Amino acid sequence: MYGSLSTHVLRCDGAPVPIALASLPLSQTTAIPETSVIDELLPVLAADSLPRLIVLGDDAALASVLTHLMRTERLHVEIGYVPVEKTYGSRAYQTGTGNAAAKRAVKGRPVETPLIRDDTGTVLVGRAEITGPGGEKLEGEAYVDDAQLFSGKVDAMIVSPMLDMPGVRASVQKNIIRRRRWLEGRAAQLGTPGAVVTRDGIANDRVLPRSSFYRHHENWLLVR
């Protein structure tokens, strides 16, 4: 199936096209892919029993694609990820970058991978940073499964997906120079007087009283 018509490239924001992807059908879209562009590709991909979509972009681009596939119940589509530069997502999923990532996206095999989402139904690919409003300290209490992550005030709470189970890991930022402690689990939950969440570099200006990131009941198919 490799290099067949079942494989399509979604090029985001004019990203440079690696040599390994040059011969594949390609669609152009914005930095954050428009759902209409994704929807146009789905019938083409659906014509094959093993559809594969390669996202050429950054973490926010991949998160947008996965969010749409999750909401439309199309997580059977194999996803290759080709970031131009290192990202939190490329580290978490060990995809590599540039042409090395492109070769893996074309020739690799799909691996069931935990899909991490938040309570708004948005997928997280690389990293979420949660702070107080205006970048102030974050006040509240957070847990990863049953283990307390913090209670009180911290500079920020960091949440990241994992390549394997249990799926989610979280830590806090403090003005203390020491190795960061990560807690792993199925879900990371925060209760707070007010928090602002930045997902994969995209800030949400809404001040929230709570935030949760957790493993979706269905995995996604990452080509590795």
Per-region residue spans from a language model:
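Catalytic core of DAGKc-family lipid kinases
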Residues: G3-A22, T29-S49, L56-G201
